[in-house]
């Protein structure tokens, strides 16, 4: 009736309440071709709840209204990748399911068998937990609980479970294209997590050397199993955060600990990224560029958008009518297409961008209509079809299982973000995955930039080339190396779909690459010359006894090390032999160094030392000779002197003075 159709209003029943046709499947959605969307772009979907839903009797239909396999509907409409979450043992001691799709290995294998019939690739998403693993909770599997304080046993557990599971998927004919080692591990995994009650953050896990080493050991154990079982599969590490600084710090921890992976992945939900699609997409581009700078491919591991703000099964949805950012796009199939279009255009603008996975795009109610909430709850308790089931009580935290003292588990909390209506009919937005494709199959060539010994000297470059075509590229220019004949132009040919590796040998310059140094130095020896460049053109600048910032170090082929000197203002001065200087403090730290707690009463005994307002040596007019103060802090300045910060008894700051000027009094 609301859509302009003639109905008998006296007998009309709200379809959201009673489970009839909501009209969503009839809403149009316009899809445009995307310039960089190829047949090989990852157009994936997580359908982990499918096995549980199927057991409960849920049916899916094609666009002709014919009942058919969910995998066939997805395949026929352009979805080429399926993501499956894997939990170790999502049941309690009575064998009752925790819900959430009941995603043990057996449930995943059922999906894999069906996907194999339609030549769809799989991404295996290892949570290394018995239930939901996310930034808030990363619980050790029950069977591993006894080992959680034994790092070596835990690494073996991770390795064995990963390897055994992959082999089982291979045995049913699964085409494993990607393996995700850990799920949304922003704050840690396997119970190595921040103590939120103490205000701890990811910095206390990934930023803590001991914790990071253990965590990276677990990642490396899982990755080792992947490399051994399915060497062509791409290893993916997944953070929920879109924060540039946070992602960069965590990637640094992985690099320091030698974690070998191929793809950096993020969760990208626009309703949690702010109220501006422009800002969210700019953030997405920054994270993709971050992955590129580290020589990694990039993919969105989870995304979605709303088909409606309505609830269709009696369990409150994650995003509903009161959500602040639910209007970034329209809440209908066209809004879903628009959200996917913007995201894919951003993702595929870089050659390291693979594509994305739509999260739980088919998690519809078992029985549509929120008046059927009890039936949906019962089905969840029996088959695990809801986000959680009664069997998870006592295992999953009460603050998640209950809301205002009432059970919050039962049905799907995602039914208004699917690409199907509540009765299993596809929405027009599903056609995005087929209709947006504008190119044929692609080859992704990973260019490894190496020296003559095969050592990588620069971040891996990724180039997409359409199969059967050629593409001209410009090789990267960077300090210390150059390609053969200094020719930076290269032509690549697409010969096969998939990922291949090609090495490009660079020659080292005599000076070599610029190595970050970043110390203040004082030139203490006159016999060494200052040079404008490494062609040994001398500089006339007088540097003896002066202090500079040495930003970079060069290990020259002549056996000497040279420093690139800069003024404090950042102006380049020249290159000088490292033996000519005395190293002072780090350029990232103040010249006076750290403030050490001192806390002693002192009396000024000498008049020859000046009092300063700051360490830029601005003199104070305050008369302090023969007066008594509290020296709260002591500084070891890189000029060789020690200074004290003086305060009055009432706590007022007075100034800084050389420690030789005072006498400690009791």
Q: Would you name each region that the model predicts?
A:
Residues 23, 308-339, 357-441:
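Aromatic-rich peripheral "rim/lid" segments of glycoside hydrolase catalytic domains that contact
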Residues 441-444, 449, 492-512:
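Conserved "repeat-terminator" motif of extracellular CCP/Sushi domains
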Residues 469-494, 555-564, 639-645:
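Surface-exposed interfaces of beta-sheet-rich extracellular modules
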């Amino acid at each position: 009736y609301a859509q302009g159709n003639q109905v008998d209003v006296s007998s009309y029943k709200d379809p959201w309440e009673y489970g009839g046709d909501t009209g969503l499947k009839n809403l149009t959605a316009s899809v445009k071709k995307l310039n960089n969307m190829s047949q090989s772009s990852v157009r994936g979907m997580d359908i982990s709840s499918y096995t549980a839903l199927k057991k409960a009797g849920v049916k899916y239909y094609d666009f002709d209204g014919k009942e058919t396999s969910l995998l066939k509907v997805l395949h026929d409409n352009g979805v080429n990748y399926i993501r499956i979450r894997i939990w170790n043992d999502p049941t309690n001691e009575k064998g009752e399911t925790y819900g959430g799709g009941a995603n043990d290995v057996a449930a995943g294998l059922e999906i894999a068998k069906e996907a194999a019939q339609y030549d769809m690739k799989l991404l295996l998403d290892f949570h290394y937990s018995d239930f939901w693993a996310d930034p808030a909770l990363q619980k050790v599997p029950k069977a591993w609980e006894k080992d959680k304080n034994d790092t070596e046993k835990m690494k073996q557990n991770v390795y064995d479970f990963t390897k055994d599971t992959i082999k089982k998927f291979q045995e049913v004919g699964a085409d494993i294209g990607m393996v995700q080692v850990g799920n949304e591990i922003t704050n840690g995994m396997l119970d190595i997590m921040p103590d939120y009650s103490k205000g701890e953050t990811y910095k206390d896990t990934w930023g803590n050397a001991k914790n990071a080493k253990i965590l990276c050991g677990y990642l490396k154990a899982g990755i080792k199993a992947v490399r051994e079982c399915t060497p062509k599969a791409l290893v993916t590490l997944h953070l929920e955060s879109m924060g540039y600084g946070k992602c960069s710090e965590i990637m640094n921890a992985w690099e320091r600990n030698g974690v070998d992976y191929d793809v950096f992945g993020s969760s990208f939900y626009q309703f949690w990224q702010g109220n501006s699609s422009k800002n969210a997409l700019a953030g997405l581009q920054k994270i993709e560029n971050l992955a590129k700078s580290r020589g990694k491919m990039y993919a969105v591991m989870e995304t979605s958008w709303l088909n409606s703000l309505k609830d269709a099964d009696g369990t409150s949805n994650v995003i509903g009518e009161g959500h602040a950012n639910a209007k970034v796009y329209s809440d209908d199939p066209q809004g879903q297409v628009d959200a996917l279009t913007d995201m894919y255009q951003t993702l595929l603008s870089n050659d390291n961008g693979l594509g994305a996975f739509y999260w739980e795009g088919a998690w519809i109610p078992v029985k549509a209509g929120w008046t059927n909430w009890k039936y949906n709850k019962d089905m969840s308790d029996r088959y695990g079809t809801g986000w959680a089931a009664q069997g998870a009580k006592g295992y999953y935290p009460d603050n998640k299982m209950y809301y205002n003292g009432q059970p919050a588990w039962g049905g799907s909390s995602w039914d208004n973000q699917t690409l199907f209506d509540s009765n299993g009919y596809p929405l027009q937005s599903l056609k995005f995955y087929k209709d947006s494709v504008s190119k044929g199959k692609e080859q992704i060539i990973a260019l490894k930039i190496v020296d003559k010994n095969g050592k990588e000297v620069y971040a891996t470059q990724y180039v997409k080339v359409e199969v059967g075509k050629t593409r001209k590229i410009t090789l990267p220019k960077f300090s210390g190396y150059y390609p053969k004949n200094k020719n930076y132009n290269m032509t690549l040919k697409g010969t096969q779909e998939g990922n291949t590796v090609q090495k490009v040998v660079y020659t080292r310059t005599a000076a070599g690459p610029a190595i970050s140094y970043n110390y203040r130095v004082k030139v203490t020896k006159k016999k060494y010359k200052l040079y404008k460049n490494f062609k040994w053109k001398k500089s006339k600048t007088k540097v003896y006894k002066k202090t500079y910032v040495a930003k970079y170090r060069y290990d020259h082929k002549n056996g000497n090390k040279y420093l690139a000197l800069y003024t404090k203002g950042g102006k380049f001065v020249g290159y000088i032999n490292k033996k000519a200087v005395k190293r002072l403090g780090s350029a990232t730290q103040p010249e006076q160094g750290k403030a050490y707690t001192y806390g002693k009463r002192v009396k000024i005994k000498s008049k020859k030392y000046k009092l300063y307002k700051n360490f830029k040596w601005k003199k104070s007019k305050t008369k302090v000779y023969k007066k008594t103060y509290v020296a709260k802090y002591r500084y070891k300045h890189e000029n060789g002197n020690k200074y004290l910060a003086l305060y009055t008894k009432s706590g007022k700051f007075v100034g800084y003075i050389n420690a030789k000027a005072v006498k400690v009094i009791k």
